[in-house]
């Protein structure tokens, strides 16, 4: 979420900023503390910036080779990276002659070239259109796995975080409030903040007695007693058209691959369901619902 400290965390890891307190470890070695500060050039960390930060006066080849020694260039590392990133045909072009996706590929190649132990990516796909972002995202994951390089990616994109990362950490006010696999984050969020950060759940107020919690959408099993917030994902709600149904469709938003239906109960409370577009729902339709736990 915005302002939580994600980009600042990357800059601290890279060594671009010094923390006021605490310590940072890499390879079980302290690289930043009250007494130790390893400079950026000695951390073996690569960085891919949101705005690419390519050198406009250098062509692709020189941008990528910027962090390489003459020996590494002579040993073919430059050509290897150009081929790996599908940039052989662009090596003599300048950044302003490239598309946004090509520029980002060059930025990634420059970060990979020296063989860093960690690559930091600061919202690397936000300036690209949806199709290009997905395509480049897949390429980045492939390259990172191929080179066996650890990466830390900062993103606001929920789909990007869940599809790219092995471990997702959700930050709030500079603190990690949950760090787990994408599946665990999505299915078992530890708080409403986490639930909202990876989807658009329906948050229902309820009160649980003897392991059963009553909500506006029915009764569910609970591991706890007392007042609770119950999170129900829109895709867990199945709708059925019924002229005598208990719920009223207010709006249907079509996305192509699926649709989001807003509906309300007799009290006027509004909820969201997500379904395949094979059934058409219109405002005013009566429906019944079934929720999969």
Language-model features: where?
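A position-specific signal in ABC ATPase nucleotide-binding domains
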Residues: 17-18, 25, 69
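Non-catalytic connector elements of ABC transporters
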Residues: 212-293
């Amino acid at each position: 979420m915005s302002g939580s400290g994600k980009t600042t965390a990357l800059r601290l890891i890279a060594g671009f900023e010094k923390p006021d307190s605490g310590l940072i470890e890499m390879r079980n070695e302290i690289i930043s503390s009250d007494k130790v500060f390893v400079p950026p050039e000695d951390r073996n960390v690569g960085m891919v910036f949101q705005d690419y930060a390519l050198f406009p006066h250098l062509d692709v080849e020189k941008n990528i080779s910027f962090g390489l020694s003459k020996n590494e260039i002579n040993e073919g590392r430059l050509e290897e990276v150009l081929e790996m990133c599908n940039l052989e045909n662009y090596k003599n072009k300048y950044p302003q002659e490239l598309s946004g996706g090509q520029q980002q590929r060059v930025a990634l190649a420059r970060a990979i070239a020296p063989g860093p132990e960690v690559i930091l990516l600061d919202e690397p796909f936000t300036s690209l259109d949806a199709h290009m972002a997905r395509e480049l995202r897949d390429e980045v994951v492939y390259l990172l796995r191929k080179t066996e390089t650890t990466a830390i990616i900062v993103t606001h994109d929920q789909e990007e975080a869940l599809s790219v990362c092995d471990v997702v950490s959700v930050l709030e006010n500079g603190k990690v409030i949950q760090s787990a696999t994408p599946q665990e984050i999505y299915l078992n969020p530890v708080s409403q903040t986490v639930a909202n950060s990876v989807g658009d759940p329906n948050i229902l107020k309820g009160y649980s007695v003897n392991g059963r919690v009553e909500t506006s959408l029915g009764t569910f099993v609970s591991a706890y007693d007392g007042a609770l917030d119950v999170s129900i994902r829109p895709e867990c709600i199945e709708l059925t058209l019924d002229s005598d149904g208990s719920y009223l469709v207010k709006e249907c938003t079509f996305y192509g691959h699926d649709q989001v239906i807003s509906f309300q109960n007799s009290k006027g409370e509004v909820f969201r369901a997500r379904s395949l577009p094979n059934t058409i729902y219109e405002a005013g339709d009566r429906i019944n619902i079934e929720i999969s736990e």
